[in-house]
Amino acid sequence: MKKTLFIVIVLLFSAQSYSQKANFKAAEKFRSSNLNQKVGDLNVRANWIHETNKFWYSYKKSDGKNYYYVDADARSKKLLFDSRYMASQIHKLIHRPYNQLDLPIRDIEFEDESTTKFTFKIDSIRFLYNMTDRNLVIKDTVPEEERSGRWATYSPDSTWIAYAKNYNLFIMKANDPDSVEIQLSTDGELHYGYASSRSDTARDKKVRSIARWFENEEKLYVIKSDSREVSDLFVINALADPRPELETYKYSMPGEENVPQHELIIYDVESRERTDVDVAKWKDQRLRVRWTSQESADKMIIERKKRDLTELEICMVDANDGELRVLFNEKQYPYIYDGYGYGNLSVLNEGDDIIWWSERTGWGHLYLYDGNGKLKRQITDGYFVTGNIMRIDTSGRELYVQAFGREEGVHPYYTMLYRVSLDKGGMKLISPEDANHSFSMSETNDYWVDNYSRVDMPNKSVLRDANGSRLLDLEEPDLSMVYETGWQMPESFVVKAKDGVTDLFGVMFKPFDFDSTRKYPVISYVYPGPQTESVPYSFSVSHRYNTALAQLGFIVVNFGHRGGSPQRNNYYHTYGYNNLRDYALADDKYGIEQLADRYDFIDVEKVGIYGHSGGGFMSTAALLTYPEFYDVAVSSAGNHDNNIYNQWWGETHHGVKEIQKKVKVKKEEEEEVEKAYPAEENDSLKTEISFKSDVPANQDLAENLKGYLLLVHGDIDNNVHPGNSIRVVDALIKANKRFDFMIMPGQRHGFGRYTQYFETMMWYYFAEHLLGDYRTNVELKDY
């Protein structure tokens, strides 16, 4: 009898130790949508007034939204207007009531540099306000065409507009009721036209074109893309009314033969003449315009890049006759990176000086070339990464640039601002605080607004001068209502990568009723990059799903992995090349193990992982690669098979192999071949070039599934096609595995109005499989 009683007690204790109640009410309380209602603005968005040292901004706190006017020279800040007075004046004029705490004002524009008058819009009405005498009048009504969308691309002084119609390019005089449209092109057709890609199938109506104006508006240029041979991709909108609708679009994939082809065309506005620039160099090359001359319409600088991304050329084009000459080239292995704000090319003095960003030393830095493509000097140098050029002071020949990892002891992902001489170098730090900074500079380069914060330090918004001196405190957020809820800041941590040397930086989210004597399952929120690491470095009260998810009774961690970001160095950034599926997995597992060794409250026997897009791909790969370690994965919109994701992504980050093959040409074909390939000393053997890419996919690992997997995808996702998830589903079914699959009807890559539903289902999934808290309620919010 005693033995039986002992067994029953042990079994009951074991069941209780495994099954814990998830705190759904706390998760609901701290859901992003609920928290964000309790906090106003975090940053000051400075709107500089023409080329002055004055700006205005709006800022919302618990007492409402106010608008401010700042004179940087005078170090002064005042209300742009009194919101209560403004609401009453608007009511008098149009007889409509508005909430004085949150006026729906938009498009504030000062008339000129010296005036104190500005216009703004509410609904379809434009008002004019005089700050001096507080006089408000109705100026005009915004035309319906302006309100409903802009199909016109205006020339710099708004004299001309360009647009597309019937796949072709048109121009006409702006603001002239008698203006006659002028057709510049006649060769446009479907998927080879002059309209922006989303408008390419439109025919009789005017739509936005891909044409761009030279600064003096004498010419336009177009990079025309030929996608006629690119294969179609399809999604079906099952919710379309009255019947499901097929959506067809062009979509090139890694290694495919038929990819978009690009050409450069220049149009002269006065003569209507067309110049086709001979840009051909490499098969399937990429092309973009990097600069056009400002004072004339004579010159432009373009970039052409090999399909395998290992080489590019910067070229000067004579816009009058189309003559092209190479200024300099760049080679980089495994590939040249120039995405997400890096890859700067800036031009000074009408092409006499060219600033170029390169990772040729293993670290991203700036280089100065002359107008003939000769390297003059390296501008920035050291074991850190230079990022965006924020501003160029042409008269003082100084740059204001972002940089990462230059300051000893400062988080290497924090954006810091520096001033550097074009001719002498010598970087000066002008954002001294140990925090993540964002910037807005005046057109005069005399002042800038600095918003800085950390995940564990709320935002501060200040006005600085060009030396970084702090002149005026502008704003700090009102977090009183947030703190009243019991909200707490997350914690930063550092772990090592699997190599035992590389530092990985992350953030930990705990339940707000945290008990250090308890054991908590751990969930890793992941995004592998390689273009960015989805780890927060600035302050937020919600951090998307992580804050709420932790309240269920989890430790949620979010940290980077080798291969995740270009902000460290080229080796770190390209670590995953040729290994796109697996490169981040070992670091994630090893990082969690280190945290479990460091903190007794982390239960490494109960591990979850989740992510969206690349994170959806990575979370499934982790569960299938380390089935003995990860127990549960929620994977949304994952690009599980990068062979059917977009061409740029797979070929850039995993690689594409260029294959050259000598083929014998039949005599009757020689004339045609000569047009396509250069002659090789009259040899009948010609070179054919093809490309091959093969990325390991998640469905190849389906046999390994041991844990719990929830796959989620929008059924009209035209970024990451739902076929990515369905291929994994197919492989899991064939492997006789039990799993869960959810379709979000009518949703694309983001889940739109179903986002909150998805988040709640994720709560249930982790609560059931990590806490053992199984619920039978049908109503999701019957917690």
Feature names for model-found ranges:
Residues 10, 27, 193-195, 468, ...:
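Glycine-centered structural positions embedded in regular secondary structure
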Residues 46, 290, 297, 303, ...:
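Serine-hydrolase catalytic core recognition
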